[in-house]
């Protein structure tokens, strides 16, 4: 071979290659990799660290504070950019890389592209066992990074410099393919990072990854149109694939043309703004009454870019036994679910092709869509105005805490604020284009039901993995991806705050303002609801000390110690005042709200299959098990 070469270390070649990756969608081209998050340590600081110091190119380098936290920021960046731009994540060997594994799981569950670069042990094995290396008697080849194999869409190891080339090409094919988008992991041996090789210059030429919109076959479109025309009450489930495809206009056009209601998954919510007349909001276990009524009525469900998780299907009890399905998805695997008619294609392109075939078709919903929506808005108004009293208060989550316990919480937390009133107050006060970020606990349920996005692509929920700690760290990534001056609000419970808030400091370090709305009910409230609803007593889900006293934590003081602007708000009036002042700030803010437990919203027309104990001495658990068995009779088996 006489091709021209350039001598680089493996790490230098990696950085040079990342700078040359571009993505083109609908004739618009942009760099695919915008930067890299890293926590330097032994294993990456003298390899990838040296390469980035010497010549980062256009890559922005951010110093993370916890590997999982920074990776969640990278995931949120890709999500907010609709999978069209990414960040890479580099971590040191051993525990640093192990910290990335949970985040890789989050990316995989949500089909979000991130390039993970965990450092590995020595390829030569000369100094083995090195600091932070695991030793297995069965194999010297097993390292911490083998844990990534189960949570990566693509996994590879680089132990020779020339292996980098094929590894990167495979990784970028996976990350830029809508059907397989997800995390790619390339483990690089730490001695290999610094080894040099004469790389062919052509390997570093500008590479454009084309995101072509796949159009279904004529057979698929014709049969899908026939099934819709034969139905009386079809409903469209708007999944994340519809959002990533930018299918808003096509969804509105088809819904208006044929009077088909739209219901949403967490990933699909805000693809179409809430005030569109046929948008009934979130569906499933955390859905609105309106959406779940429409799904109950449906004789045909058109799933667009959805994975049909149990929270979308109410553990496969949401649909009638005769309901049929059409699944439109770029992933052929996803189209097979629920014995659906399979349409493999891009959501936006498919809807554009399908709409002309349905001209003249009208559903039989009539004015039911408007009636359902009006009923739901009245219920939302009720939830906005819930007020605590010390004599005979009935919370939304009934029959779990008695009045004395609720009064104890009111006294200890010095609050009478309900969670639903606080959340809707935030929705009504922030700017319409604000991005809201959340992931775990009871707040995703309140958000899917009660948060009304006025602007598309402003609802950012990680609910594929529902990973506690994503909320604040993900808010940083969303802010990095947001338009100038677009505010980002992290909606987080005290449980998730304690789990991880590392990148709060990073947001202050780099001037990326986020607003943290901290709901403190002194416990893991969501899971407490679940355990008590299934017959157990309240057991290790409340934050109580060894004397059984409710814990009182000043979370505002914690954030203030980092340098954030903080507020305390236990009333609607104080919350509005804090929100308005926070808008004027240029650095990260935190509003510490004490809210009463059991005041989050409850479900509507839903059921969740969980592993209730079949054998117990408690009658309440026996009853919960019998109720589960009864509900399973109404569930599809697959």
From Swiss-Prot:
Keywords from the named record: Hydrolase, Magnesium, Metal-binding, NAD, Thiamine pyrophosphate
Entry note: cofactor: Binds 1 Mg(2+) ion per subunit. Binds 1 thiamine pyrophosphate per subunit.
Pathway(s) served: Polyol metabolism; myo-inositol degradation into acetyl-CoA; acetyl-CoA from myo-inositol: step 3/7
GO cellular component, one term: acetolactate synthase complex
Reaction(s) the record says it catalyses: 3D-3,5/4-trihydroxycyclohexane-1,2-dione + H2O = 5-deoxy-D-glucuronate + H(+)
EC number(s) on file: 3.7.1.22
UniProt KW Magnesium keyword: yes
One GO MF term: acetolactate synthase activity
Residue numbers binding thiamine diphosphate: 67
UniProt GO BP: inositol catabolic process; isoleucine biosynthetic process; L-valine biosynthetic process
Binding-site list for Mg(2+): 494, 521
Keyword Metal-binding: yes
Renumbered residue ranges of the record's region Thiamine pyrophosphate binding: 442-523
Top-level taxonomic group: Bacteria
Listed cofactors: Mg(2+); thiamine diphosphate
Entry's family note: Belongs to the TPP enzyme family.
Function field: Involved in the cleavage of the C1-C2 bond of 3D-(3,5/4)-trihydroxycyclohexane-1,2-dione (THcHDO) to yield 5-deoxy-glucuronate (5DG).
Name recorded for this polypeptide: 3D-(3,5/4)-trihydroxycyclohexane-1,2-dione hydrolase
Organism field: Listeria monocytogenes serovar 1/2a (strain ATCC BAA-679 / EGD-e)
